[in-house]
Structure formats: structure tokens, C-alpha cells
């Protein structure tokens, strides 16, 4: 009962923060808007300059893919942490003890800033999973590929399955973890979207546990389609690993729903899918 009451109080505080941030959208003066744009410009300038230098290092290390992965994680820790610090965003991290072992880390995706959190917090020896078209993203796509992260071909089911088999082979041979956004795209309003099945297929083949990584408030710190970054409190919460050793192919839909429901229960009302509030209590 006490745990439920604490969760309810936390959700109310987060909802108040969401309402306040929405109201602030109409109050921002020109100075705050320009300051926010300036911060974004500075951050992207830093990313651009360092990405070029890091890309050259990655080219030199082409014969050593595992070293590229580890150094790519190090680059992400430095740049991701620097960007978060420059934005001045207050952060609370919970459950970091659940990141000590190999796993498939999954995260909800509601803001452009989520990518920097993933870069900053991914354990050393972790590869990202993205659609194969990421290689065409200017500079960062090429850096992603050079860092030996995994690209999934989603053009048809057969290609996707083959891509996932290759992903499992890589992480098994190199003793790596995975990190990915199971929604497959970014939410427009911060509310949780349906999950794709890819992360479950990867868990079935690799037998790695799944560690949910729940981001709360990022959609208020940097809203999709805007150039305004706000110092809104953000919580990063890791849940205990979910064992997948006894999972079977015939229950894939059940596993997807189970983990999606875990997110619904742990997100504040402002980030739950519409119509899910009562079901998640």
C-alpha cells in the first residue's frame, strides 16, 4: 500500500511538472528562446567537430571491430554526458545496479535528447540497434556504422530475420550487450507507442535478459519538432533484469505485451498511452 501511495504521489508531481512545462511554452520570452537555440547550436557544433575526429580514429581501427565498439561507447559517455550537462537538465538515476551484466537494454523514446541519454548511459561493450537507413544520416550515421553498431534491414520479414541472426552472432561472439528503442520511432507527444517485436526475437535467440530503461520527462525537456530545451527534471529508472531463458517462440506477442505493460505501469499519466490509466493501476 505504501509503495502504491508513493508511486501515486510521484506520478502527480510528474503530471504537475508536465502541466507547468506546457504553460511555460506560452511564457517564454525571446531571450529564453534564443538561449535555447544557442545551446542546441553549441551542442551540435561540439558533436560535429568531435564526430569528425572520432570518425578518423574509427577508420584507423577498421581491422579491430571490438575496439571500435568500446571506444565508441567511451565517445558516447563523454559527448552524451557533456550535452546533458550543457543543457543544464537535473537528472535522477535509479536502479543503476541493474546495468552490471550483459543484457538487452530497452528504452522508451519521446524526445531528440533520448539519444544522448542512451549514448551517455550505455555500458561499455554495448552496441545499438537501428534500421539500416541510419547510415544515410549525415555524419552521425557514418559514425554509427564505423563504431560497428548493428543495422537491421526492415524491408521485408525475411531480411529482418536474417539481420537479427547476424546481430545475435556478433553479440555472442564478442560478448556484448544491446541497447534499442522497442517503439521503433519517436513519440510525438511523449506517450508510449506500441512496441515492435524485434527485441523479443533478439532475446529468444541470444537468451540475454531484458533490462527496461524508463525515461521520464524527456519529452518536456526537448519537444519533438522544436528548438527549445528546458531544464525539466528527468528520471532514468532501470528495472530488474527480466530472464528470458524459458521464453518460447509461440508466446512472442505475450512477451511484447507483458513488457509494454511494465512501461505503462511505471510511466506517469502524461506518458501513458491514452486510455491505459485505469488498466495500469
Swiss-Prot record:
The chain crosses the membrane at residues 40-60, 71-91, 110-130. Its EC number is 2.3.1.51. GO terms for molecular function: 1-acylglycerol-3-phosphate O-acyltransferase activity. Signal peptide: none annotated. It is found in: Membrane. Disulfide bonds: none annotated. Pathway: Phospholipid metabolism; CDP-diacylglycerol biosynthesis; CDP-diacylglycerol from sn-glycerol 3-phosphate: step 2/3. Keywords: Acyltransferase, Lipid biosynthesis, Lipid metabolism, Membrane, Phospholipid biosynthesis, Phospholipid metabolism, Transferase, Transmembrane, Transmembrane helix. GO terms for biological process: CDP-diacylglycerol biosynthetic process; phosphatidic acid biosynthetic process. Pfam families: Acyltransferase. It is an enzyme of class 2 (transferase). It is a multi-pass membrane protein. NCBIfam families: AGP_acyltrn. Converts lysophosphatidic acid (LPA) into phosphatidic acid by incorporating acyl moiety at the 2 position. This enzyme uses erucoyl-CoA as an acyl donor. Belongs to the 1-acyl-sn-glycerol-3-phosphate acyltransferase family. The HXXXXD motif is essential for acyltransferase activity and may constitute the binding site for the phosphate moiety of the glycerol-3-phosphate. This is 1-acyl-sn-glycerol-3-phosphate acyltransferase. The lineage of its organism: Eukaryota, Viridiplantae, Streptophyta, Embryophyta, Tracheophyta.
